């Protein structure tokens, strides 16, 4: 992005969590990412600069059509991004063409990367990786920690943390009730 690296803007808390869980210093890091897909040459044929100006046929074919994506996401918006529109009709916002959410992801002036991987090696030889991607059916965080004695995984959507100690029955913790 123009103001800061996307990985910091979108994943600083994820990186903090990794460092906290590892409880040691990162000794080596590698990272790769780029604006791979959301470029004009990958736009659906006949697409317009704003989703509201696309034909019904293009809207139907386009996986990233704002009219498909935003109404459902508006219901879950809590902070940032779409939350600033709470109480407003998303269809009116898209038709106004005043906000970047109405702009076609392929034709926008966005320079933020759409995918990135970060690999970290820690001082004892253990490692961790982080994948940030725009290419997911659901837009929420998924955390999966693999250890020598078990694994822990969960996501930011349902508030459930699955704890699997190898050889034992899975324990599910509902963080909303704990």
Question: PLM ranges: what are they?
Answer:
Residues 80-86, 92-97, 107-112, 117-120, ...:
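Generic detector of short, locally flexible boundary/turn motifs and exposed helical patches
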Residues 1-103:
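Predominantly a Rossmann-like dinucleotide-binding segment in NAD(P)-dependent oxidoreductases
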Residues 112-178:
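C-terminal helical cap and adjacent loop that interface with cofactors, partners, or active-site loops
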Residues 6-9, 106-110, 133-134:
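Short Gly/Pro-enriched turn/cap motifs at secondary-structure boundaries
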Residues 32, 36-38, 85, 91, ...:
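Phenylalanine-focused residue identity feature
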Residues 14-16, 53, 89, 99, ...:
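Acidic-enriched, low-complexity/disordered segments with a strong bias for Aspartate over Glutamate
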